[in-house]
Amino acid sequence: MRTPIMSCCRLMAVALFLFCSMPLFAQRQDILLNDNWKFRFSHQVQKGSEIRVDLPHTWNTQDALSGKIDYKRGIGNYEKKLFIRPEWQGKRLFLRFEGANSIADVFINRRHIGEHRGGYGAFVFEITGEVNYGKENSILVR
C-alpha cells in the first residue's frame, strides 16, 4: 500500500542519492589568478614600462592625496601568462572576474573573447576554445 509518507521517503532517498553522487560527475577546480600581473597604461609602449601588481588593483588611488586637482584617466592594460595543463583538454575552462571598472575587454592569446560594461559586478567568459593546451597562454584585460 502506497502512502504519501512512503512516496515522500522514496523521493527524498532518490534526491539524497543524486545529491551525494553529484561530486563524482562534476568536480570543479578554482585557481586564483590574482598574483603577479603586469600593468601599464596603453600609451606606455616602451618595453619595461610595466609594473608588477596583484589584484585587486587601481592605478589612481594616490591621486587625491597628491594635491593635484585632476586624477589619472585612460586605458590600463593588465597582462598575465597562464600555463594551461594538457590534462585539462576536454574540460570547460572559464575566466571569472569579481569586477573591473568600467569597461573591460578581455583577450586570450591576442584574440578578443569578450567585453564587460559595469564597475562592480562579477562576470565570466568561457575560454575553452581559445587556449593552447600544454603551453603558456597570454591573458590581457584592457
Q: Residues of each region from the PLM?
A:
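Accessory beta-strand-rich segments of carbohydrate-active enzymes
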Residues: 40-42, 73-142
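Bacterial Sec-dependent N-terminal signal peptides
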Residues: 1-28
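Accessory carbohydrate-binding/adhesion or oligomerization-edge regions at the termini
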Residues: 23-69, 83, 113, 138-142
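Sequence-pattern detector for short linear motifs
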Residues: 5, 13, 62-66, 83, ...
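Short non-domain terminal segments
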Residues: 15-17, 23, 37, 92-95
